[in-house]
Design a protein with these regions (language model features):
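A surface-exposed beta-strand-loop module
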Residues: 341-360
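Short, hydrophobic/aromatic-enriched beta-strand segments in well-ordered soluble domains
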Residues: 263, 316-337, 360-372
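Carbohydrate-binding/catalytic loop surfaces
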Residues: 20-46
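Polysaccharide-binding surfaces and accessory modules of carbohydrate-active proteins
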Residues: 264-325
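Non-catalytic terminal regions with compositionally biased, polar/charged low complexity
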Residues: 354-361, 366-446
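Short, hydrophobic/proline-enriched secondary-structure or compact coil segments at domain edges
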Residues: 216-218, 305, 309, 396-406
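Aromatic-lined, polymer-binding surfaces characteristic
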Residues: 1-14
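Catalytic and substrate-binding regions of extracellular carbohydrate-active enzymes
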Residues: 46, 52-284, 358-364, 368-371
């Protein structure tokens, strides 16, 4: 039973193209076509009750073992028993007893949109300092990326194919991931001896509704004296062309800090709604903890309470909308500083910096929309459907975020901060209206 569940978990941790999500020191491009997964699928089929869904994977792999397991798979495919392997939303717990955090994968449709949320344990020397980080995929293409590792495996010209120095100075560092950094210092001070003692904790996971799927987890040890809770929701609403992601990151700290929240995207910037200055010469953003590898390409200030950043990649449009404060800085960065051997990709990022505050909330939506065809030269639905994003309430008990569409409709997402039971009743009064619901969150009209 354990082996079969392990094979299923491996297959669930792949994108639409069968490539594994590059968690920790994972290599991008590694997929279920590798020989070890051919073996795993064949053996699991033979000894695990001949699950016909595994035949769908075997057909994708295009090869079988030359033994009893492979013959069983080949015959079953020949006899027309194959079924498609269903990718589903799943929450995988970490640790020998399943209590050391985990990895959650939220999916909409046939991998139309896939979110990977990592709140796991450190995982030995290959682990990264990336608590509560996430990545986002659309049909197998990275929208917001996890960098992966800095190694050119078995390519002799690059360090003999071994791990390169930048794997430690960049890829493992917190700022290399889509997660929160305090005071330009990595989680656990970037020390394995500290990180290996801790893990994040699940607050709740709910995929019972295909239209609103939510995962929430808490980290209290990455920065002593600071509690971070991140709630990620994948929402399919008729007001928007495609599903959108809502990201609520709540911080409670005993001291004022500098907070940096980066988002690593691909493609070409289309439009922003804030003014920014580009330096005459590029300089590193910092001196350590990965910051020494980031060039600062632009810096600006929010022009409104909702900051908008849009880009295009591979014929698709994306918009990030964030509820920003007037004192925030908006940074445009690019990887490549202090990299004399060109071991790093030149990847861009949009970073929100909030300085001199203790308790705070970051609220952000990531929206996929529209398309562009160079053949027809037609650009469709290039603009965001979100007019504004506002944190309308934050307390020890609840955080509420209002999403306003361009047509004027307003949706309200409320997450419970003190009780996460599935049947727990809640009441929150905002202005002259009270909202009642059961469970750890509420989404609906305002």
């Amino acid at each position: 039973g354990v082996l079969l569940r392990a094979v299923d978990a491996l297959l669930q941790l792949t994108d639409a193209d069968g490539e594994f999500f590059p968690l920790n020191d994972g290599q991008k491009g590694m997929s279920w076509h590798t020989s070890s997964l051919v073996t795993a699928v064949n053996v699991a089929f033979l000894v695990g009750g001949e699950d016909p869904r595994l035949l769908g994977i075997a057909e994708e792999q295009g090869q079988v073992l030359l033994d009893d397991a492979g013959i069983a798979v080949a015959r079953a495919i020949r006899d027309g028993k194959s079924q498609a392997f269903e990718k589903r939303s799943v929450n995988l717990s970490d640790g020998s007893d399943g209590t050391q955090g985990g990895v959650a994968v939220l999916r909409y449709g046939d991998d139309d949109l896939t979110l990977v949320f990592k709140y796991a344990a450190q995982r030995l020397s290959h682990g990264h300092y990336d608590k509560l980080s996430f990545s986002l995929y659309e049909k197998g293409d990275e929208v917001l990326q996890d960098y992966g590792l800095v190694r050119f495996v078995n390519i002799e010209q690059k360090g003999g194919g071994n791990y390169l120095p930048e794997n430690r100075s960049w890829a493992k560092q917190t700022v290399a991931h889509n997660t929160l950094v305090l005071n330009e210092t990595s989680h656990f001070e970037g020390k394995y001896e500290i990180g290996s003692q801790h893990h994040s904790d699940l607050w709740f996971y709910d995929d019972s509704s295909p239209d609103v799927q939510v995962v929430s987890a808490t980290e209290t040890n990455a920065y002593p004296g600071t509690a971070i809770r991140r709630t990620l929701a994948m929402i399919k609403d008729d007001a928007f062309e495609k599903p959108l992601v809502l990201d609520i990151l709540k911080v409670d700290s005993g001291q004022e800090n500098r907070y940096d929240l980066p988002f690593y995207y691909f493609g070409q910037v289309m439009k922003v709604n804030f003014e920014y200055d580009s330096p005459d010469s590029l300089v590193p953003l910092g001196e350590k903890s990965g910051y020494q590898h980031l060039y600062l390409e632009g810096v600006g200030k929010p022009a409104s309470e909702s900051t908008r950043f849009s880009w295009m990649d591979d014929g698709r449009f994306y918009t990030l909308t964030s509820a920003t404060d007037a004192g925030d800085e908006l940074l445009l960065t690019r990887l490549g500083a202090n990299d004399p051997d060109f071991n790093l990709r030149r990847d861009p990022a949009f970073m929100i910096r909030r300085d001199g505050v203790a308790d705070t909330v970051f609220a952000t939506t990531i929206e996929t929309h529209g398309s562009y065809s160079p053949v027809s030269e037609r650009a469709l639905n290039t603009n965001s459907s979100i007019a504004g994003l506002e944190i309308v309430h934050d307390s020890d008990d609840y955080t509420a975020v209002a999403i306003t569409g361009v047509a004027g409709q307003v949706s309200l997402f409320i997450v419970a901060n003190s009780e996460s039971g599935a049947s727990q009743g809640h009441v929150l009064t905002l202005g002259d209206r009270s909202y009642k619901w059961a469970g750890p969150y509420r989404y609906g009209p305002r």
